[in-house]
From Swiss-Prot:
The keyword Lipid metabolism does not apply. The keyword Signal does not apply. Belongs to the eIF-1A family. This is Translation initiation factor 1A. Seems to be required for maximal rate of protein biosynthesis. Enhances ribosome dissociation into subunits and stabilizes the binding of the initiator Met-tRNA(I) to 40 S ribosomal subunits. Residues 24-98 form the S1-like domain. Coiled coil: none annotated. Keywords: Initiation factor, Protein biosynthesis. It comes from the Archaea. InterPro entries: NA-bd_OB-fold, RNA-binding_domain_S1_IF1, TIF_eIF-1A, TIF_eIF-1A_CS. One of its GO terms (molecular function) is translation initiation factor activity.
């Protein structure tokens, strides 16, 4: 990395202009894999939660083992869930958004109106 590259990145940061890179950093649900947005309604214990999904259904979601200790999920958190193929009333949590990421998605109208509680 040359000094010119460093100077340009600092200039972009200082000017406050959003470039294409900043938009690409927020993870979005992969619709081809069946992933969707959801809002955590209730913690049910034992790594289970009740999630209101963007299609209007409330699903029983579970937190996979790889995320249990690493990512703490609370009520009213925005998450990405993937419904099970053989039991569509259940789902797995794929990703949890921070409050900053969720408000960014809401401001840029990337959330469906059904679950946009950040208005």
């Amino acid at each position: 990395m040359s000094e010119d590259d460093v100077d340009n990145s600092v200039k972009d940061f200082e000017s406050g202009e959003e470039n294409e890179e900043s938009i690409g950093r927020v993870i979005l649900p992969n619709k081809k894999k069946g992933e969707m947005f959801g809002i955590v309604e209730k913690m049910e214990g034992a790594s289970r939660l009740s999630v209101m999904c963007e299609d209007g259904y409330t699903r029983n979601a579970r937190i996979p083992g790889r995320m249990r200790k690493r990512m703490w999920i609370r009520e009213k958190d925005l998450v990405i869930v993937k419904p099970w193929e053989f039991q569509p009333e259940k789902a797995d949590v794929v990703y949890r958004y921070t409050k900053t990421q969720a408000s960014y998605l809401s401001r840029n109208h990337m959330l469906p109106e059904v679950i946009d509680i950040f208005k």
